[in-house]
Amino acid sequence: MNFQLDLIKDKVEFFEAASLQELEKKINTQIENNKAIMLRVKSVSHQTLVAEGRILYSAVVHFSAEA
């Protein structure tokens, strides 16, 4: 049996929440999870959407392998 592990070099994750605090908590949790596989934050992009009187916060986080 041949078993091979590949290194993850880049990973993009999407997050959304009803409040900024909840969004920040979700992102921070995933940052800690990705540290275990040696990925660090390369960039963060975020948006706010108002739809039907409600605010929705979203973010895209690009994780990259440590150099």
Curated annotation (Swiss-Prot):
Pfam family, one: DUF2536
Coiled-coil positions: 17-47
Keywords associated with the record: Coiled coil
Protein's name according to its UniProt entry: Uncharacterized protein YrzA
Gene source species: Bacillus subtilis (strain 168)
Gene name of the encoded protein: yrzA
